[in-house]
Amino acid sequence: MLDRTTAPLIKDPIHFNFELPAINTYALSNGVPLYWLHAGVLDVVEINWIFEAGIWQEPLQGVANATAALLKNGTTTQTAKQINEQLELYGASLKIGASNDYASITLHCLVKHVPAILPTIASI
């Protein structure tokens, strides 16, 4: 049984060696900055697109969230069903949302499927 009338001894935190991976930068031909890092040995990737299009930039209340919600509802070249079927075919996950400061699109998939999925994301 623990004696809760006396405080436990204070111990030093466990020592560990923590190093962040190097962040690489690149500018695309259209001037958009690209940042990436190699974070491990798994063949999975997370790609984030960040846009200055959050709630603070919306002309009317609700526009940012409504726009984010509509992005997966089809494009001029693909229906919502086609987009979802392609993501499902490759086991990919796509999250689209808006916050106060920005809107974002996040893709999770296997590295080998990126070339097949990117055209769909570009059409969105």
Predicted regions and their residues:
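Acidic/histidine-enriched segments that form metal/cofactor-coordinating
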Residues: L2-R4, E88-I124
